[in-house]
Curated annotation (Swiss-Prot):
PROSITE patterns given in the database record: AA_TRNA_LIGASE_II
UniProt gene name: asnS
Keywords linked to the UniProt accession: Aminoacyl-tRNA synthetase, ATP-binding, Cytoplasm, Ligase, Nucleotide-binding, Protein biosynthesis
Family the UniProt entry places it in: Belongs to the class-II aminoacyl-tRNA synthetase family.
Domain of life: Archaea
The reaction(s) this protein catalyses: tRNA(Asn) + L-asparagine + ATP = L-asparaginyl-tRNA(Asn) + AMP + diphosphate + H(+)
Record carries keyword tRNA-binding: no
GO molecular function list: asparagine-tRNA ligase activity; ATP binding; nucleic acid binding
HAMAP family (UniProt xref): Asn_tRNA_synth
Predominant localisation class: cytoplasm
One example of a Gene Ontology biological process annotation: asparaginyl-tRNA aminoacylation
Protein name listed in UniProt: Asparagine--tRNA ligase
Length: 429
C-alpha cells in the first residue's frame, strides 16, 4: 500500500498501485466515474469504468458520497487533464464506509465551520494548516536542541501568578484556590541554575474577554530562559530562531503555503537582523502616521497593526516604560524609567508574537520591585529564593505559537491557526 504522494510519480506509471483514502470529489459521465481520492499526502484522480467492473461494483463505487472511505488497486498513468497530472484506472476496490451527504459544502459560514471543526479539519486548506503548524512546533524544538537547550516541563496548576491575577482562571483544588498557568517563566527560571538553557512548549490560559482576531483563552506558549545572557543577546537568539523556523517551513511546506495563498518568497525575505526600535521612538512613529499616542500609553492591537505596516520585517520594540511592564524586568541603568525588555512585532499588521526581557537577578532590586507592585511577598517565596543562592544574570522570552503560525501562513484570524480554538464564546467541539 502506497501513499498517494508515493504512488503519483513517474516511477509508477504503467504499474499497478494500491492506495487508500477518502472521496474528495466524485462525478459520473458517459459510463465513467471520476473520483478524486485524498489522503494525508495529497490527492489523485481515479477512474472507474462501467465496462471494466461488474454492474454491482460500478453501482457501488459510483454512488459513493464525499468523505466515503475506501482502498483501491489500479494502474497508474499520466493524465494531463487531472488535478495532479496522474490518474489511476481502478481494477479492484474495497469500501470501508459509504457516506450519503457530507454536512460541509463550499458555501458554509464561519460559525458553522467552527461548530463542525471536527469535520472541517479534513479540508485541503486545513490539512495544510495542520502540516505547517506541525513544522513550526518541530522546528522550534529542533532549533533549541541544536543550541544546547534542554526541554523541560512545568505545572499547569499554580498558586502564584506571573503577571497579575485579573486574567487568571481560578480552579478549586480540593478546597484550595489555585489557577491555570499563564506562563512557565518562573518555573523555567528555577531550572537555569542546573541546566543553564531551558525551553518548554505548553498551553497557557488567559481569562481575557477579548474578541479580537488574535486572542485565544487557551493558546500554545513556547518559552525559554537562559543563564548568563542579557536582553540584547536574547533578541539575537529570537531572531535567529524565527528565521530558522521560516526556512524550515519553506523547505518542508512550500506547496502548503502556496495552497493557503502565502507567498513563500515574501517569507524568505524576513532575514535577520530585525530592526530594534525603542518604545519612545515607536511613539513618535505612531504619531507620524496619525495615531494619538503619548509616552506611557500601552500599544494595543490596533496600534501594533498600524505600526508594523511601516516595517517589512519583524521589529523589536525595546525599553518600555517601567510602569507598563511586570515587576521582574530590570530598570535600564542608563534610563531608570525604562526596563530592559523587548516585544517582537510581526509585520503585515500581525503585531506582537514575542515578549521577553532580561530578568532581575539582584535580591534587593527584586524585593524593592515586588513591594512597589504591592504583591504578597510570601506568595513568591520560592521565586525570591532564587536570588539568594547563586543568582546570575539571565534573560527569557515567551512566544505565542498560534500567533506565529497565523503570521507565517498569512491567516485572517487566529482561530484558523489552531485545530480547536477556545475563546470567550467557544468551548466546543
Amino acid at each position: 500500500m502506497l501513499s498517494i504522494a508515493e504512488a503519483s510519480s513517474e516511477a509508477h506509471v504503467g504499474s499497478e498501485v494500491s492506495v487508500r483514502g477518502w472521496v474528495y470529489r466524485i462525478r459520473s459521465s458517459g459510463g465513467v466515474t471520476f473520483i478524486v481520492i485524498r489522503d494525508s499526502t495529497g490527492i489523485v484522480q481515479c477512474t472507474a469504468k462501467k465496462n471494466e467492473l461488474t454492474p454491482e461494483q460500478y453501482d457501488e463505487i459510483s454512488s459513493l458520497g464525499i468523505e466515503s472511505s475506501l482502498s483501491l488497486i489500479g494502474t497508474m498513468k499520466k493524465e494531463p487533464r487531472s488535478p495532479t497530472g496522474y490518474e489511476i484506472s481502478i481494477h479492484k476496490f474495497t469500501v470501508y464506509q459509504k457516506n450519503d451527504v457530507f454536512p460541509i459544502t463550499k458555501d458554509q459560514g464561519e460559525e458553522f465551520l467552527l461548530d463542525n471543526r471536527h469535520l472541517w479539519l479534513r479540508s485541503r486548506e486545513f490539512t495544510s494548516i495542520l502540516k505547517v503548524r506541525s513544522t513550526i512546533f518541530r522546528s522550534f524544538a529542533d532549533f533549541f536542541y541544536d543550541q544546547g537547550y534542554y526541554q523541560v516541563h512545568t505545572p499547569f496548576m499554580v498558586s502564584t501568578a506571573v503577571e497579575g491575577g485579573s486574567t487568571l482562571f481560578k480552579v478549586d483544588f480540593f478546597g484550595e484556590p489555585i489557577f491555570l498557568n499563564q506562563s512557565a517563566q518562573f518555573y523555567l527560571e528555577t531550572m537555569i541554575y542546573s541546566l543553564e538553557k531551558v525551553f518548554t512548549i505548553a498551553p497557557s490560559f488567559r481569562a481575557e474577554k477579548s474578541r479580537t482576531r488574535r486572542h485565544l483563552t487557551e493558546y500554545w506558549h513556547a518559552e525559554a530562559e537562559v543563564a548568563w545572557i542579557d536582553n540584547r543577546e536574547m533578541m539575537d537568539v529570537e531572531e535567529n530562531m524565527i528565521y530558522y523556523i521560516i526556512q524550515r517551513v519553506i523547505e518542508e511546506n512550500y506547496d502548503d503555503l502556496k495552497l493557503l495563498g502565502r507567498d513563500p518568497e515574501a517569507l524568505r525575505a524576513m532575514k535577520p537582523p530585525f530592526p530594534r526600535v525603542k518604545y519612545s521612538d515607536i511613539i513618535k512613529v505612531a504619531n507620524e502616521i496619525g495615531m494619538q499616542l503619548k509616552y506611557g500609553d500601552d500599544l494595543g492591537a490596533d496600534e501594533e497593526r498600524q505600526i508594523t505596516m511601516r516595517y517589512c520585517k519583524p521589529v523589536f520594540v525595546t525599553n518600555y516604560p517601567k510602569e507598563l511592564k511586570p515587576f521582574y524586568m530590570p530598570q535600564d541603568p542608563d534610563n531608570p524609567s525604562e526596563v530592559l525588555n523587548h516585544d517582537l512585532l510581526a509585520p503585515e499588521g500581525y503585531g506582537e508574537i514575542i515578549g521577553g526581557s532580561q530578568r532581575i537577578w539582584d535580591y534587593k532590586e527584586l524585593m524593592q520591585r515586588i513591594r512597589e507592585a504591592g504583591l504578597d511577598e510570601s506568595a513568591y517565596y520560592w521565586y525570591i529564593d532564587l536570588r539568594k543562592y547563586g543568582s546570575v544574570p539571565h534573560s527569557g522570552f515567551g512566544l505565542g505559537m498560534d500567533r506565529l503560525a497565523m503570521w507565517i501562513m498569512h491567516l485572517d484570524n487566529i482561530r484558523e491557526a489552531i485545530p480547536y480554538p477556545r475563546t470567550i464564546r467557544r468551548t466546543k467541539p
